[in-house]
Amino acid sequence: MEGVLYKWTNYLSGWQPRWFLLCGGILSYYDSPEDAWKGCKGSIQMAVCEIQVHSVDNTRMDLIIPGEQYFYLKARSVAERQRWLVALGSAKACLTDSRTQKEKEFAENTENLKTKMSELRLYCDLLVQQVDKTKEVTTTGVSSSEEGIDVGTLLKSTCNTFLKTLEECMQIANAAFTSELLYRTPPGSPQLAMLKSNKMKHPIVPIHNSLERQMELNSCENGSLNMEINDDEEILVRNKSSLCLKPAETDCSISSEENTDDNITVQGEMMKENGEESLGNHDSDLAQPELHSTSSSPESHWEEDQEVIPTFFSTMNTSFSDIELLEDSGIPTEAFLASCYAVVPVLDKLGPTVFAPVKMDLVGNIKKVNQKYITNKEEFTTLQKIVLHEVEADVAQVRNSATEALLWLKRGLKFLKGFLTEVKNGEKDIQTALNNAYGKTLRQHHGWVVRGVFALALRAAPSYEDFVAALTIKEGDHQKAAFSVGMQRDLSLYLPAMEKQLAILDTLYEVHGLESDEVV
């Protein structure tokens, strides 16, 4: 289905007409049908979103991925909204049925595998008994050849049954537990889906269980020990290493090679030492860090005395502190935008409802810059190249340009940085921290209407305890003393890196006279 719907953009532009296209379970929107060749301005996966009908406005409907993505839409009439609701609901139902069927097949295969494994254990025990019986017959020197033949026949039959059952187990396992079924995300998922990992409630360490299982399955199937680690697992392994390395003065060597494929294949062997699992390999693109203590000071042994607790900032998919600047302090576009997406959930933790307008503006500006980037990824490798390209084309200060979007994006990031700095420096009143950060950054660019919106949002700010609790990975961690240490540790790495990149952008905008005093 396709047609025009009104979409809420921001408090400045309000409701704007957009051309929407529902295809393959994905709802995409464009400025107009004629501009479709430029690529969609945004999309949402129907299988994972909620469809909500507005309680008052009978032409409005909201599409929401909780904590991640929001589409506020209005049709031109009640009948038109009804047609869209039927189409969207049908698309969601079809995708849900498909996922339910896959989950059902997965559960059935799991039960079948458990049954076969029980049979396998029975045949294994029987096989051991018959081997012992054969040894006994051989050692006692029984002359009855008939008894020896019977024992040999039974042993052969049991071996054949054991091998057949083992083969059936492997067939079920290969069908039910492939990496594609376990780790694959739905095709066409919005980029914001990467933020899901920030809401993980399980500890980082148990990842080795799934890695070990995958290695065992692949070794039986291919005859060699192969392990596939998808992007999310690679990030978790990296974060787990960084948790041990960041607080102390240690040397860490991690050799990695960028791979354009979705997965990274590592060949190696699994070794267990002192109850802890470690991954070792010889021909690998991912080398494990080696820890060398460089100091006998209390700081260098802090991990021996305190529990290392991961926080929201240490488990980000991509962090500003992970970004490596390119030549001439070039800020890599893709990594920067991914880091911006990763910090957006902080606004949800402050209040998913009252801070929704702030979040929508921030995400909207990220998407505008990304839209420019995907038009020519080879050329626009850095943010500076995007800005300079628009400066040369004399469109840098045109409304909705990538340069204008980046201007407001960096202002929004300065607000978040200012707020987090206040928290890091010991401010226990979240409302005060937000107000101080807003006064130093965004307030001068806002008119009285937008200032009023922010004032309302500030009044609804959570308590310090609730905000800190929302930054935990495991429920209850915020009550531990080590969590405060972890927050200080992570923010001490995160905020300086963020400040450095924003300073580079400030210099770029000042040199080319792109700063604007316009008030919105």
Curated annotation (Swiss-Prot):
Compartment(s) of residence: Cytoplasm; Golgi apparatus, trans-Golgi network membrane; Membrane
| Organism annotation | Bos taurus (Bovine)
What information about domains appears in the record's comments?
The PH domain of FAPPS binds the small GTPase ARF1 and phosphatidylinositol-4-phosphate (PtdIns4P) with high selectivity, and is required for recruitment of FAPPs to the trans-Golgi network (TGN).
Q: Which gene encodes it?
A: PLEKHA8
**What is the designated name of this protein?**
Pleckstrin homology domain-containing family A member 8
What's this protein's function? Cargo transport protein that is required for apical transport from the trans-Golgi network (TGN). Transports AQP2 from the trans-Golgi network (TGN) to sites of AQP2 phosphorylation. Mediates the non-vesicular transport of glucosylceramide (GlcCer) from the trans-Golgi network (TGN) to the plasma membrane and plays a pivotal role in the synthesis of complex glycosphingolipids. Binding of both phosphatidylinositol 4-phosphate (PIP) and ARF1 are essential for the GlcCer transfer ability.
Lineage, top-rank taxon, reads Eukaryota
Listed A to Z, the keywords are:
Cytoplasm, Golgi apparatus, Lipid transport, Lipid-binding, Membrane, Phosphoprotein, Protein transport, Transport
Positions of the PH domain? 1-93
Cite the Pfam families for this sequence.
Answer: GLTP, PH
